[in-house]
A protein has these predicted regions:
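Membrane-proximal envelope and lipid/glycan-remodeling enzymes
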Residues: 3-506
């Protein structure tokens, strides 16, 4: 009877975690919905264009391949299409729904991990909170920053449960979320005996899930990989002398408290990973806790960080979502397992893991404090560098739509929010494939031999006959208040007062 009771308690532990994750997702979305970054609106513009016109691009009538996360756009596009039952498309509402769903998936994944590893329910709460309260993550809502931890945690759950077919499906969804997440898929697969023994079937399901999109992308758009890889590599100099590898230090100099509460859980995860490796391979433990897939998740985060440092991309803050959330997840799982083991093994003391969980919880609360200190709802993201607030960009974009008509305009350098609200031909490398082709050729010519070869293979089918479109107008940004006609004054928490000026091209 006691054994049956313990089994029943384990199977029902944390059943409320999916609801908790969904509710917390709804709460944070209500807080941030009016302060989305310009890059988030690039994704929303893609989703709107897909739902309304059935086109893959930022602006209608101009196909592009600058959506970093195909799965994010496809999900948002489908949800936006569903919102049309109320009239017009509502991509921001679709984003809210997806945020709630991601929160629920995180809760579900932690509930399953809790059942498999006998984790305390508090570990699941911490695991969800470290994602949904992280200021770096919330500052990039609209991009794939919630989809990444959701799909990676589901992938890990399926590895823990030894389900190779579904692991393959989740692996395919992971690379559709971001192609670079293949790092996690491979590391977790080869580190989990149940998956490794059935590697071919798992790989087959992954290919069946992801290959159709990549085949279409390679032929129709001339590239497996979104053009943003090339664009962001060429923009790395914007942050000079900082790089992706040193980016956390750069952000610490500007937002020290925010960086501490966002990155310290991952640092604890690195320490926990080293401790796990020492205990796992340095001594023979009877019935050692089955943390292998979760350790692989954390190791994947470290390898991802090293890979991005090697690629030479700039330290855009949303690029840290994958390593930070994955290594933080391992920290929670390791400390939770340590605590659970201490309750059944007399040789282990419960105090140290309880302190570790408490410290992790304090960091999650610190993240919440930073979020609340920003003001509710957020007037701007905590980590922010755009020239104008989302509200001001919306005003400028709406007025541009009436002024431009069918004419085209060169982007000032930030295109997402303007394109979303203007629904007009705003041109730059993100929306005009001709400009993207020019950048691709430049990157191939300047890359090292290995990168150049990879890019040549990737862009084998690229239509290089496409030339940049000539704009009818040009929109330019300058600091200070607006002073003349065809200008709009804006304000940004990062840049202060500035203005945009519209001029006719000769």
């Amino acid at each position: 009877m006691p054994a049956a009771t313990n089994t029943e308690r384990t199977s029902t532990r944390g059943r409320w975690l999916p609801a908790f994750g969904a509710l917390l997702g709804a709460a944070v979305f209500l807080a941030v919905r009016g302060s989305l970054t310009d890059d988030a609106y690039i994704t929303l513009a893609y989703a709107k264009n897909l739902a309304v016109h059935g086109e893959w691009g930022i602006v209608p009538g101009s196909p592009a391949n600058s959506a970093t996360s195909p799965l994010n756009v496809l999900l948002l596009g489908a949800l936006t299409l569903a919102t049309r039952v109320t009239g017009g498309p509502h991509p921001v509402v679709a984003l809210g729904i997806l945020t709630v769903l991601c929160g629920g998936v995180l809760g579900w994944a932690w509930q399953r991990l809790g059942r498999s590893l006998a984790l305390p329910a508090a570990a699941g709460v911490l695991g969800v909170a470290l994602v949904l309260l992280n200021p770096f993550v919330l500052s990039a809502i609209g991009l794939e920053v919630l989809l990444i931890p959701a799909v990676l945690l589901v992938l890990t759950v399926l590895a823990v449960e030894g389900r190779p077919a579904w692991f393959g499906v989740a692996g395919g969804l992971a690379v559709l979320t971001r192609l670079d997440l293949v790092v996690f898929v491979v590391v977790i697969a080869v580190s989990t005996p149940a998956i490794r023994r059935r590697l071919l079937p798992a790989a087959g399901f992954a290919v069946v899930t992801a290959a159709p999109w990549f085949a279409v992308s390679w032929v129709a758009f001339g590239s497996f990989v979104p053009d943003t890889l090339v664009i962001k590599q060429l923009q790395a100099g914007l942050f000079a002398p900082w790089s992706y590898g040193t980016g956390p230090v750069m952000y610490y100099l500007g937002w020290p408290v925010t960086v501490l509460v966002s990155f310290l859980p991952a640092l604890l995860g690195v320490v926990a990973l080293a401790g796990w490796a020492a205990a796992r391979f340095g001594a023979r433990w009877p019935e050692f806790p089955a943390l292998g897939p979760l350790a692989a998740l954390g190791a994947g985060g470290l390898l991802y960080y090293l890979t991005y440092s090697f690629l030479g991309v700039g330290p855009f803050h949303w690029y840290y979502a994958a390593p930070v959330t994955s290594v933080s997840a391992f920290a929670v799982a390791a400390f939770g397992t340590w605590y659970a083991e201490s309750r059944t093994r007399t040789a282990l003391r419960a105090g140290p893991p309880a302190v570790a969980l408490g410290l992790t919880g304090a960091l999650a609360l610190g993240g919440a404090a930073v979020d609340v200190a920003q003001g509710l709802p957020w007037p701007s993201p905590v980590i922010f560098g755009n020239w104008a607030s989302a509200t001001d960009y919306a005003r400028v974009g709406t007025e541009l739509r009436g002024q431009l008509g069918d004419a085209s305009v060169a982007s000032p350098g930030e295109i997402g929010t303007l394109a979303y609200f203007c629904e007009c031909a705003i041109l730059d490398e993100f929306s005009d494939r001709g400009q993207a082709v020019t950048l691709v050729d430049k990157r191939i010519a300047t890359a090292n031999p290995l990168m150049s070869l990879a890019l040549r293979v990737n862009y084998h089918w690229l239509d290089r006959s496409v030339t940049p479109r000539k704009p009818d107008y040009r929109l330019q940004y300058a600091s200070g208040p607006a002073t003349g006609p065809d200008s709009w004054q804006v304000r940004s928490a990062a840049k202060g007062v500035g203005h945009f000026v519209l001029t006719r091209e000769p």
